[in-house]
């Protein structure tokens, strides 16, 4: 299976409806602790940016470099819209 096909298969697998417990088990099996921490950190950055908090304040609050926050801001503004869709769905 090519990487492209494997990625599509992964997307299909992730699309299946799961409980919070099932998601936790899947992510624990799929990702290393560091990868899970990085994803949670990135999501926290996106949520704070979307709330209107200034980048420097986020960097200070999370003890992260301003470049990490700027990257999150750039993806939120110029990315493919995945974060915006997720934020919108969470508000419902």
Regions found by a protein language model. Give the residues of each.
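Short alpha-helical "recognition helix" segments of helix-turn-helix
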Residues: 57-62
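Short, solvent-exposed alpha-helical "recognition" segments
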Residues: 73-87
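Short, amphipathic alpha-helical "recognition" segments used to contact nucleic acids or chromatin
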Residues: 39-53
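General nucleic-acid-binding
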Residues: 1-15
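Short, Lys/Arg-enriched anionic-surface-contact patches
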Residues: 22-41
